[in-house]
Amino acid sequence: MKFAISSSILSQRLQTLGRVIASKNSMPILDNFLFQVHDNHLELTASDSELTLHTTLELIESDGPIDFTVNAKTIQDAIKEIPEQPLEFTVDPDNLDITVTYQNGHYNLVGQNAQEYPLTPDLEGEISTLGADAARLFSGINRALFAAADDPLRPVMNGVFFDFNTDGLAVVASDGRKLSCTRLLDVTTDTPASFILHKKPANIVRNILQKEVGDVTIRFNGRNAVIASECYDLSCRLIEGKFPNYNSVIPKDNPNLVTLNRTAMIAALRRVLIFSNAGSPLVKLHIEAGRLVLSTRDADYGRSGEEALACQYEGQPMNIGFKGTLLMELLNNLEGEEIVVQLADPSRAGIIVPAEQHEHEHVLMLLMPMMLND
């Protein structure tokens, strides 16, 4: 049996599917990609037993249906070394010997029986179905992932929370010290629903959506979710448990408002952090009318750094401390030229938002303060 396909398109899809393959699988067959040829199309599948990614490609030609699996790393590494050209696969249906022929050579591989490959069960029970714009969903997940925890004692914090309600879809992650929340205001539902996506599938969805256009369909029940874009279908197990009430930790009354240039803030913060204590990089923010002063000190080595930035400030003069490395993370995961820092007092969380929000979107970052010694 033979079929032909573009080398660059196949390589691109295999590279994406390869992110699913675990370094150590409970089932040896999961070290393989599943190939299914029918109706002049090639369906490719990768799985680690809890996460399955599926894509369909159009073939240049084929002379019949066949299913087989082949080692993922071998085929992935081999195909990516071939420049764009048609590849011809010849598969012996009896012993699954595979020959991949290209312009200047060929590869010989041995496949395995596709019947050994585990099938992904369909969603059952009460299923919620919603849609979202691929580009905005990418932005929400991209902003959230850095804030997710890595805490075996609190597994619900180790992923990205999707909260659908009448106000829109909130894409949230937090590790207890920092929080990222992106609200997609045009994704609404009359029946509130939510789920927590593990970091691994969230990372894969982010990588997929970076190149996708149009709408994404999200279907989920209490245990599993299916996220379908134009080119990929991802099925995965969800994190079970209740995500904390993130709205309750966001201060509502923040009369002190600092507006300043985000890029200038990042550059100044990077410079003063050189002089901070490596174990506890505390950065002090002194805010007064017209300027914000960043300062750090490392008493162990007798060094310190200070830099002033121009800003617009509405409020009383204030000193507040933050962990500098976390503040840098927040600023790097925001967009736009100007940001607004919203503060209540030095003991409460600081909120950072873009000065201008995108249409149908509201972005908010939160950072818990550190105690100042002076």
Which residue ranges define each predicted feature?
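Structural preference for solvent-exposed beta-strand-turn elements
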Residues: 1-374
